[in-house]
UniProtKB/Swiss-Prot annotation:
One of its GO terms (cellular component) is cytosol. Phosphorylation of dTMP to form dTDP in both de novo and salvage pathways of dTTP synthesis. GO terms for molecular function: ATP binding; dTMP kinase activity. Disulfide bonds: none annotated. HAMAP family: Thymidylate_kinase. SUPFAM superfamilies: P-loop containing nucleoside triphosphate hydrolases. This is Thymidylate kinase.
Length: 212
């Protein structure tokens, strides 16, 4: 039986890392996963050895080597193509479950809505990079850009996080539009982490039990 593929999306500061860990702790004991299935947690960019190198280029390049906008898009696509072909597809084909911090939604939101690149072009690159692999469920941890910026105040920022509030607002709007798609669910990430996790549990159980 093919495994299930779950994705957490959201702007920087929304609490994805915390919720990914909580979900990874809960899922194996939830009764949703078949006996013998393993749970794999991963991220984009950086879910493979090649992806780690690309992540460094994308998020922490020397100033004079920062990728231009279209180059940035292509580097994210390369990271995803490697991730899908060498890690996601083999795991799912083996019956394992995959939980990913970011996937295609982030590219549409950040490079499409945030950077202003053509969404049709991004969709074409997505189809090439993923070979059609779509998540079974995508959870958008929705948090206002202002609150996200407050949460990250004083923390070291990577190149994307340092883009500023106006950029973050465009990305947030992108996620809001993407969340209207089938298999996307909105989570109120402004609540305390325990309450956010309760929402995540409910939405995962509801979404996957319908598909099982």
């Amino acid at each position: 039986m093919r495994g299930r593929f779950l994705v957490l999306e959201g702007i920087d500061g929304c609490g994805k890392t915390t919720q990914l860990k909580a979900l990874a702790d809960w899922l194996p004991a939830s009764g949703l996963m078949p006996s013998g299935a393993q749970l794999i947690t991963t991220r984009e960019p950086g879910g493979t050895a090649l992806g780690q190198a690309l992540r460094q280029l994308l998020l922490h390049p020397p100033e004079e080597q920062a990728p231009a906008t279209r180059a940035e898009l292509l580097l994210y696509a390369a990271d995803r193509a490697q991730h899908v072909q060498t890690r996601l597809e083999p795991a799912l084909a083996a019956g394992d479950w995959v939980l990913s911090d970011r996937y295609c939604g982030s590219t549409a939101a950040y490079q499409g809505y945030g950077r202003g690149l053509d969404l049709d072009l991004i969709t074409q690159l997505e189809q090439l990079a993923t070979a059609g692999l779509q998540p079974d469920l995508c959870l958008w941890l929705e948090l206002s850009p202002e609150l996200a910026a407050q949460r990250r105040s004083g923390q070291q920022q990577d190149r994307i996080e340092a883009e500023g509030l106006a950029f973050l607002a465009r990305v947030h709007q992108g996620f809001a539009e993407l969340s209207q798609r089938p298999l996307w669910r909105r989570v109120d990430a402004s609540l305390p982490p325990e309450q956010v996790h309760q929402q995540v549990q409910h939405l995962v159980r509801e979404g996957l039990e319908l598909a099982l």
